[in-house]
Swiss-Prot record:
SUPFAM superfamilies: omega toxin-like. The lineage of its organism: Eukaryota, Metazoa, Ecdysozoa, Arthropoda, Chelicerata. Expressed by the venom gland. This is Intrepicalcin. Residues 1-27 form the signal peptide.
Length: 69
């Protein structure tokens, strides 16, 4: 009886841990996609030595300001 109880506790622990890990991964991915969508939609200005969206900044037209693609 004791082995059966320990096995059940172990299985519940593994399932709980796996569920929390999956939830954390989904939450971080959703947060990243949300930030990227906001940046792409508004074409925020790139700061010096930093890109707001991706690793590519390009100059557009005669205006020397840089915008994210």
């Amino acid at each position: 009886m004791r082995q059966n109880t320990m096995t059940i506790i172990f299985i519940v622990f593994i399932v709980t841990f796996a569920s929390l890990t999956i939830y954390g991964a989904e939450a971080s991915e959703a947060n990243f996609l949300e930030r990227r969508a906001d940046c792409l939609a508004h074409l925020k200005l790139c700061k010096k030595n930093k890109d707001c969206c991706s690793k590519k900044c390009s100059r557009r037209g005669t205006n020397p300001e840089q915008r994210c693609r």
